[in-house]
Every structure is written in C-alpha cells, then in structure tokens.
Amino acid sequence: MTRVFIANAKTEERSALRLMLLNLDLEVVGDASDWETTLVKAPATNFNLLLVDWDLLPANAVTSLSAMRQACSNAIIVVLTSYLDAHQQAAQSAGADAFISKGEIPNRLADHLLAISRNLNSYETTRSKNESESIPRSIL
C-alpha cells in the first residue's frame, strides 16, 4: 500500500489532499505545515510517497530536498506547485521525482496520484530481496 506524507503550510489544502488520498484508498501516514517538522516527522512514518508544496520549501530547495532524499532514499518525492513551468527545473534539480500543478482539476490530480501509486506498488511487489535497493525514478 502507498503510504503518503503531506507537507503543506495551508490547513485547507492538507485536508483536501488527505480526503482525496483516502478516497483513492491511499494511506496518509502524517502531515506537517512546515519543512522543519517534515524533516523530523516524515522519516519516522516510513512513508513511500511525499507530497510537498513547493512554497513550503526553504529558500534553498536543493539542499532541503537533498536532506529528505538522504533520510528517505526509497521514497518518491512529488512537488505540488502553482507555477509548474517556473519551478519544474528547480524542483528537478532539487531532487523531486515528479511535479503536479495545483491548478489541475481534482480528477486529473487524482489520476496522477493513482498512477504514481500503482507504479510504486508494482515496483515494491516485484523488487528483489535487496531491501536497501533504491526505487528507480523511471517508475514514474
């Protein structure tokens, strides 16, 4: 099962994402409203999918996402952004695996998240016994 951690400063957006994820039968294992809390709480939840709002990241997004990648190398990081074109290259450089525009209609957002979840679950079901093996970014 896909275990999702939500990192978003806005309570209403976290709540909406939580509801959508639960409706998609994805497990929400935690959330945080700031990056410092995310770095502390998220690794302890054993999440395998992090949804993070670009605006939540500190000024140096590359360093911030790199720290999360080091703590949780087997997780997929999906950046949610209001400005997909403007932030996509920066997010990719920072270590994000996927990008989703906050402007997407709910059904399209749900489709993106389900596709990521299916690919992640398929990989976890078939991966070798080497538990330390990182998730290939090509599954997205």
Question: Language-model segments: which ranges?
Answer:
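A short, hydrophobic beta-strand element within the central beta-sheet of small alpha/beta folds
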Residues: 74-86
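CheY-like receiver
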Residues: 120-140
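Conserved phosphotransfer microenvironments
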Residues: 51-68, 84
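Alpha4 helix (beta4-alpha4-beta5 surface) of REC/receiver domains from two-component response regulators
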Residues: 83-100
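Acidic, metal-coordinating helix/loop segments flanking the phosphotransfer/catalytic sites
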Residues: 31-49
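Conserved phosphotransfer cores of two-component systems
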Residues: 43-45, 68-74, 94
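Two-component/phosphorelay signaling modules centered on CheY-like receiver
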Residues: 11-30
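C-terminal output helix
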Residues: 86, 104-114
